[in-house]
Structure formats: C-alpha cells, structure tokens
Amino acid sequence: MSGDKPAQPRLVVTLDGPSGSGKSTLARQLARELGWHYVDSGAWYRAVIWAVLESGALTADEAKALELLSQNSFRCQPDGLIAFHGKVLGPEIRSAEIDTAVSDLADLAEVRTAINKTIQKQLQAPQVEGVVADGRDAGSVIFPHAQLKVYVDVPLETRARRRHQQNLDSDIASDHATILQSLTDR
C-alpha cells in the first residue's frame, strides 16, 4: 500500500450527520444487508467512558482511558457492539450517566486518536471484507479513504422526536423539550 493511505478493510462506507439523523440505524441495516462489519464510533467513546467510570474514576480520566485502550481491553464486534474484557456492552453504555460524561472524553485529543487507531487496527484483519461505519471521525479520520461517504440530515424536530423515542424504547427517562434544546445547543 502507498505510504499515505492507511491499511483498511477492502470496502468501506461511512455515514456522517448530526445526532438523531438516523445514520446509525441506516448504517446498521446496510451492514446487516451486506454481511459486513458495523462500526459505531460513538459506542467506542461510550464503552471507554463506561470502563473509566467502572474503574472508580469520577470523570473522564484521560490517563485511565489511555491505559485501558493500551491494554487491548476493547474489541469490535461485527454487529457494532463493543466487548470489554470479553463482556459485550449493551444498555449500560446508553445510560444518562454515560450521556453526561461521554462528551468530555471525546474532547480529549489523545483519547480520540487512541480510539481511532484501535478501530483501524482491529478492522485491518484480512477476513474483514467490508465495513459500514458511522459517527465521530468515521469518514474523516478512521476511514479517510472510504469508497463511499454519505451525509445524512433531517430536520431538527425529527431528530429530537427520534432521539426521544429511542430513549423511551431503551427505558431511559426522556423529555422531548430537553432533547430538542440539547440538539439545538450543539
């Protein structure tokens, strides 16, 4: 491979767009239809902050996050879930506590770099034919040479309604007006 093109799976599609636009739903469905790996980069940040908080830290502890990532404790699952020390993480990374802490972690440049490199490394395996990825840095940093990059956008009110319903479906307390304001503030 050329020096400026990082190793990546043979075929990559990335979806980007604002929170609540439906990009994760579309990416997950597309990956399932194609039989490819699905990567939800947002789930990575959630998994890392969950592990940091589980370790006893009270905030987005950069040193602890980097330590956990350097230990190869996290693994991509083909369906987009993340395993930590073999335990597949699900609803525990979608809690209000994680929602509050995850943006602080995502603001840490070294942690973002470490997460992105971990995803790239794990998906370079020859058996990974294709990847559909969405979320932070998917098309710009993780897979900059993706064969197809899609931007998904929908009106703000639709995004708020989708996120509110998603929370309710996951048994997470939710207030439509609060979500609408949060999305507006982003």
Task: List each language-model region with its residue ranges.
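Phosphate-binding P-loop
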Residues: 4-10
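ATP-dependent small-molecule kinase phosphotransfer cores
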Residues: 43-129, 157-161, 165, 169, ...
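Hydrophobic positions on the alpha1 helix immediately C-terminal to the Walker A/P-loop
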Residues: 26
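Short, well-ordered beta-strand core segments
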Residues: 131, 147-151
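Hydrophobic anchor at the beta1->P-loop junction of P-loop NTPases
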Residues: 13-15
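Conserved lysine of the Walker
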Residues: 23
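P-loop (Walker A) phosphate-binding loop of NTP-binding proteins
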Residues: 18
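Active-site signature of alpha/beta-hydrolase-fold catalytic machinery across serine-
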Residues: 29
